[in-house]
Amino acid sequence: MNALTAVQNNAVDSGQDYSGFTLIPSAQSPRLLELTFTEQTTNRFLEQVAEWPVQALEYKSFLRFRVGKILDDLCANQLQPLLLKTLLNRAEGALLINAVGIDDVAQADEMVKLATAVAHLIGRSNFDAMSGQYYARFVVKNVDNSDSYLRQPHRVMELHNDGTYVEEITDYVLMMKIDEQNMQGGNSLLLHLDDWEHLDLFFRHPLARRPMRFAAPPSKNVSKDVFHPVFDVDQQGRPVMRYIDQFVQPKDFEEGVWLSELSDTIETSKGTLSVPVPVGKFLLINNLFWLHGRDRFTPHPDLRRELMRQRGYFAYATHHYQTHQ
């Protein structure tokens, strides 16, 4: 924890009753909360959205907000304010979300509907160029020949922020487990900026605010490079970050050495959380002050994991980056 932003006392209210879901601190950290929709809420939600296939949500973007309202109404309109409060709270900003009864790949469409409803209670998910939709589904297998670490199973996918190589602001990231077979390892890795021991050192460095070039590989379907600094500040002057080691392109020796040292200290941070995410559950994090990655898998010839992601912006009038927008 650093001197810039200490954790404030804003833990889950003990004894707080919610309608349609429960909320508890996770076993890994009080910053990460576990939200579970009851079986009744899950069943009623799926019944009320059954008339709209996933394709309808893809074609008619307003339906994504409609299913969000249905879910919030089933939770006595307590869900939306709770989601926003948690994700915007610097001391927390992360949720592990589960719906009782949704836990099998045969329910993949239901998973997409649920995740879409939750995401569109806090904002709107951006267009994902990799998939051509507002969400992306992708598979990790035992052998991979892709052009990034996203699908490579036998190595750690280093901690990073999403949205570094696009111009849209990426306030939140949602990562859902759709299927898993013959899997050992591969936990999600999370690091809150304020738990990174070397934040002050790198945030105060002269290179922290220098715009750098970010370029994505062909699989991302993004051909335009973007330029922005690794660090910025929020409206209260606290550090936020837009960083990924694979796609930042240092222009010279000074930038390359600084980025390499930054990467080393992030990857060795003792503040990193290892979070198992079972099938049907998803992580929802504030992308400005949480970094995420993935631990390595144990090799198996029939290893398979399918994931779904959404990333987008909070539905607020103000930007959450203070300077470089």
Swiss-Prot record:
Cofactor note: Binds 1 Fe(2+) ion per subunit.
Pfam families the record matches: CsiD
SUPFAM superfamilies assigned to the protein according to its UniProt record, in alphabetical order: Clavaminate synthase-like (SSF51197)
EC number: 1.14.11.64
Cofactor(s) this protein cannot do without: Fe(2+)
Binding site for Fe cation: 160, 162, 292
Pathway entry: Amino-acid degradation
Catalytic reaction list: glutarate + 2-oxoglutarate + O2 = (S)-2-hydroxyglutarate + succinate + CO2
Keywords (A to Z) from UniProt: Dioxygenase, Iron, Metal-binding, Oxidoreductase
Uppermost EC category: oxidoreductase
GO molecular-function terms, A-Z: ferrous iron binding; glutarate dioxygenase activity; oxidoreductase activity, acting on paired donors, with incorporation or reduction of molecular oxygen, with 2-oxoglutarate as one donor, and the other dehydrogenated
Keyword Cell membrane: no
Subunit structure: Homotetramer.
Function: Acts as an alpha-ketoglutarate-dependent dioxygenase catalyzing hydroxylation of glutarate (GA) to L-2-hydroxyglutarate (L2HG). Functions in a L-lysine degradation pathway that proceeds via cadaverine, glutarate and L-2-hydroxyglutarate.
Protein family (similarity comment): Belongs to the glutarate hydroxylase family.
Protein name per its UniProtKB record: Glutarate 2-hydroxylase
Gene name tied to this protein: glaH
